[in-house]
Curated annotation (Swiss-Prot):
It comes from Afipia carboxidovorans (strain ATCC 49405 / DSM 1227 / KCTC 32145 / OM5). Pathway: Amino-acid biosynthesis; L-arginine biosynthesis; N(2)-acetyl-L-ornithine from L-glutamate: step 3/4. Its EC number is 1.2.1.38. Pfam families: Semialdhyde_dh, Semialdhyde_dhC_1. The gene is argC. The lineage of its organism: Bacteria, Pseudomonadati, Pseudomonadota, Alphaproteobacteria, Hyphomicrobiales. This is N-acetyl-gamma-glutamyl-phosphate reductase. The keyword NADP applies. One of its GO terms (cellular component) is cytoplasm.
Length: 352
């Protein structure tokens, strides 16, 4: 049997870190040898997430205590906040340049330093790595991911919108200036740190929009849609927070270009993803339920005809912690390390 690859997870005490552990524990070709969580250093992973108590996992340590050169890690997942990430990875890759990285923060998703500074409020301090990073929407950039040392894992909202829209923009099948994305997220998308507005009594029985007109994922959507369309695209995007744990659900309104109908758009997407294991295009006119992807690495996409001539409604859904974060990160790892893309990710959605 081939020797297992040594894997580290930075920021293991958050939801995406825990999801990475869950997925990698059943991966036959890797071994988790490093888990960091500065505020939980010295604790066991099972102390932070009791579901991991039965498993033989390394003790949580602080990042500052890690000797990157001595660790000889094959790949690191970075689930740290933006700004912190660029400093940590600059140090890591200077001391262990052969280590590959999948970054789940926003630090390396945007290719223009000025755009990053505008949306995130500070200058980027690892510009060489920013230019090196490959955007990790696996189904679209698989060839680039395969050759990359540093992959910027896309955001959850952006993955859910880009998978249906990028193929249509590339095919010039829709008007690029008439895209409206109405998206909903589960509570885990807000992270694990304690916040008053995230208390059960504050979110239960309610539903609200946030970041209206200025959510940071708009910059990511604009960048990738502009590349696909071959011209500048400014998207209308409104996110909402819903009282469920997991899930992204996007309802997208588009106009067909040059007489393209909703059925034409459905055919384009069906052909695009017919061989992709983690994207399922429903029969025309059918729409997905977020429950049907929960806990899986799947994205379900539906296309329906609007009653307005020339317009179509696209509905896509994924699990924000899996395909929207850690699952896609493992998918990228598989491509980077030469494994089968589905390895460790082929479990179906939870039934309830």
């Amino acid at each position: 049997m081939a020797e297992k690859k040594k894997i580290g997870i930075l920021g293991a005490s958050g939801y995406t870190g825990a999801e990475l552990v869950r997925l990698l524990l059943r991966h036959p070709r890797v071994e988790i040898v490093l888990l960091t969580a500065d505020r939980r250093a010295g604790h066991k992973m099972g102390d932070v997430f009791p579901q991991f108590a039965p498993y033989d996992l390394p003790q949580l340590v602080s990042i500052d205590s890690v000797d990157w050169a001595a660790a000889k890690l094959d790949l690191v997942f970075c689930a740290l906040p933006h700004a912190t990430t660029q400093t940590v990875l600059k140090d890591l890759l200077s001391k262990a340049p052969e280590t590959k990285v999948v970054d789940l923060s926003a630090d390396f998703r945007l290719q223009d330093p000025a755009v990053y500074a505008k949306w995130y409020g500070h200058e980027h301090h690892a510009l060489d790595l920013q230019q090196e990073a490959v955007y990790g929407l696996t189904e679209i950039y698989r060839r680039d991911v395969k050759k990359a040392r540093l992959v910027a894992n896309p955001g959850c909202y952006t993955t859910c919108a880009q998978l249906p829209l990028i193929p249509l923009l590339k095919a010039k099948a829709i008007e690029s200036d008439e895209i409206v994305i109405d998206a909903k997220s589960g509570m885990t998308g807000a992270g694990r740190s304690a916040k008053e507005e995230m208390l059960f009594s504050e979110v239960s029985e309610g539903f609200h929009a946030y970041g209206v007109g200025h959510h940071r994922h708009m910059s990511e959507l604009d960048q990738e849609f502009s590349k696909a369309a071959g011209k500048d695209v400014l998207v209308t995007f409104t996110p909402h927070l819903t009282p469920m744990n997991r899930g992204i659900y996007s309802t997208i309104y588009v106009r067909g270009r040059r007489g393209k109908t909703a059925r034409d758009l459905h055919e384009t997407l069906s052909k695009q993803y017919e061989k992709d294991p983690f994207v399922y295009v429903l029969p025309f006119g059918k729409t997905p339920n977020s429950r049907h992807v929960r806990g899986s690495n799947m994205t379900f996409i539906g296309v329906a005809e609007d009653r307005k001539p020339g317009r179509a409604i696209i509905v896509s859904t994924l699990d924000n912690l899996t395909k929207g974060a850690s699952g896609q990160a493992v998918q990228n790892m598989n491509v980077m390390l030469g494994f089968a893309e589905t390895l460790g990710l082929d479990q179906p959605a939870l039934s309830s």
